[in-house]
């Protein structure tokens, strides 16, 4: 989260009103820009669960934003299957507590991304 303030979801859908120095404002700006420019679906994804209260708050914020903008979320943070892995799998799939290895992306995350994207599109 890089210590960027979380911010709050606004009532506006006007790009000029978003505080892009906050997580909420930056996400809302991206969604608004994509809607105005390309008029295509927007999909965000969350990281698999790790020990971070600030990231947990950001995931909650993203769900608030989802309600406002009707975007899609591939939510690994709250995905029991993704987060319920053995220590052996954790060593194979993660470089550290946050960043997946190549195997982590390919074997652990990719099947979830494929399934959700098929549901969405």
Which residues fall in each region the model found?
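Residue-level detector of functional hotspots within protein domains
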Residues: 13, 28, 91
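Amphipathic, non-transmembrane alpha-helical secondary structure
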Residues: 21-28, 32, 110-114, 118
